Amino acid sequence: MLFSKLFAPTLKEPPKDAVLKSHKHLAQAGYIYQVGSGIYNFLPLAKKVLDKIENITHKRMQEHGAQNILMSFVVLASLWEKSGRLDKYGKELLVFKDRKDNDFVLSPTLEENITEIAANFIKSYKQLPVHLYQIHTKFRDEIRPRFGLVRAREFIMKDGYSFHEDAESLDKEFLNTQSAYKEILSDLGLDFRIVEADSGAIGGSKSREFVVLTECGEDTIVVCKNCDYAANIEIAKRSKRPEPLNVPKAQLAKFPTPNTTSAQSVAEFFKTEPYFVLKALVRKVIHKDKETLACFFVRGDDNLEEVKALNALNLLGANALELREASKEDLNNAGLIAGFIGPYGLKKHVSYIIFDEDLKEGDCLIVGANEKDFHAVGVDLKGFENLVYADIVQVKESDHCPDCQGELKYHKSLEVGHIFKLGQGYAKSLKASFLDKNGKERFFEMGCYGIGISRLLSAILEQKSDDLGCVWTKNTAPFDVVIVVSNWKDEAQKKLAFEVYERLRQKGVDALLDDRDARFGAKMRDFELIGERLALIVGKQTLESKEFECIKRANLEKQTLKDTELEEKILEMLKSE
């Protein structure tokens, strides 16, 4: 490829609204062009990288038995209504009408579509298991699209779905796909982790995320310093904590506690640890057609994990869509006083009450008395009947691992893949069944598997690039080598550059010849910005010495290559990371 023919409209400066280096580099180097909020055009350089990512993905998925299909981007809204997700998914789901007043959605995910296909064409256990996948455009109407391709509204995704006759078969395919994803991300040269995760709006009994470790990441994962335990903070667990020595032993009594509305101030008032203070967190629960209140109790030195809290509510059958912090008006209307909320008589004020599981058999507690400026001491939760316990706290750094007791630490991460065990939920709601070996009708067990293809461009750059521009991994760079001519007006340099260009191409090297009549410094700046893996310099000294200067983009390390061994050395360098 000649640079003069390459459509790569580089910019002098990155966009002013670009925050992440991946967004800055992709826009400035001419990889992407923004159409609107969270919507991007992929220009030739980006398309080359995307093609490489997609080819690796196709190769590994098909090696693991998955079959490639292509489904409609536009889906009937009635399918989403049948599955119950039309309302649950919220405003991120873009719904529109055609000229005949039929409702459709732009798919952010395709469980409904693929389940309908299975329902129509898979009739017998003999056709199972089957794993179908696609790489296609998706749309999610993000309220605040940001960070370039990291949080876009329109994006490219590899999504796959598997159908099984029983849970055992699903378990095998779940692990099979996990292996495929590990191979894909390893081929892409990424440093990644597999973590336990919440299933969110997709649903299902179990899910795992594939995350890239990067400080720009929107997610926090919790990892053990001693073992392989890793989980998204939304579902991370910890071992049971030891009780502090300073136990506030007291008979049950009510004490005046003026202006002590926080767990810390209550602990200081009674000269004890926040561990023994019962912290009440009231949330407004948003249902499909109503709003209620829920109160969550945790120890005073803990914080509520909102995702765990929502999941705990739904295990009670609440069918909650989301949680919002209760306002002062909400509390007043319910007859509650912020800072003094406790379990006594609380059932008449809220619809749901959940205690963190760390409070099981909790005693010597200090709790709000549901009366302004009063707390109760010496409270033993064993004296209450039918309390509901669940894991609802957010794990803290320095908490201990549930597997080995090692210390837990936080890491910022960016999700690039997610796999789910969906079970029979979608099959039941969409009436997707088959006949088993006994001729009995049964619902499919389903799995769901996704990789953010376009997001991977940003993930690679966030992990590998520097302040100068793009640094791609071995299998993702748009070109292997760029040949940079020091003085394009020198016919001898130009002639040698074309000769080298042809020699490398004959060896299968994807080379770019910078044939522009531009300053040498400007050409090198574009090399640093675009991120070809190697730059091969052709200059006056090359003509005299028959030696080339070669620069690795990853670390800007320079090497001198003799003309007689040029192709051999270039191929060696390209094979290395």
Curated annotation (Swiss-Prot):
GO cellular-component term (any): cytosol
Domain of life according to the entry: Bacteria
MF GO annotations: aminoacyl-tRNA deacylase activity; ATP binding; proline-tRNA ligase activity
GO biological process: prolyl-tRNA aminoacylation
Keyword terms, alphabetized: Aminoacyl-tRNA synthetase, ATP-binding, Cytoplasm, Ligase, Nucleotide-binding, Protein biosynthesis
PANTHER family referenced in this protein's UniProt entry, alphabetically: MITOCHONDRIAL RIBOSOME PROTEIN L39/PROLYL-TRNA LIGASE FAMILY MEMBER (PTHR42753), PROLINE--TRNA LIGASE (PTHR42753:SF2)
Subunit architecture: Homodimer.
Protein name according to UniProt: Proline--tRNA ligase
Organism field: Helicobacter pylori (strain Shi470)
Lineage, opening ranks: Bacteria, Pseudomonadati, Campylobacterota, Epsilonproteobacteria, Campylobacterales
